[in-house]
Amino acid sequence: MRYPQFYDMYRDAIKNTWTVDEIDFSTDLNDLDSKITPAERHLVNRLVAFFATGDSIVANNLVLNLYQHINAPEARMYLSRQLYEEALHVQFYLTLLDNYIPDMAEREAAFAAVENIPSIKQKADFCFKYMSSLNGVDELNTKDERRQFLMNLICFATCIEGLFFFAAFAYV
């Protein structure tokens, strides 16, 4: 095994397994109806929509860019587990949207936030810029190709997961 740290990360991630079905949303629904203001509810709806679309973008980057260029089996095991986590997060946020926003038109408007709300659209465009920077890069042979790959990795690990998501979680 060339990179035992990835195998250790994979094993640690397996220990952290959970499912959306384990979560009881009934208390949240009561709180949404009786304990928060309309402005706070609006914020919750926006955050959930942002997280659902954001984690979908992160999952796409894992599949389209990282997996292609990371070939060590133990590293791919960890990436596969991370992809599972991203899918689980998307399932969780979709379930939240289904529960928190029962009106289909409101739910569709929440999902359209990635296209219609300037701050969310700017974040998505930032992600797409770095995702598309690796289009056509089949191998990491040149210094520029490796730089593009590292920029993608830094963008997603630091800016998106570390800044965009954590800043949004601070509201919660």
Regions found by a protein language model. Give the residues of each.
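Non-heme di-metal
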Residues: M1-V172
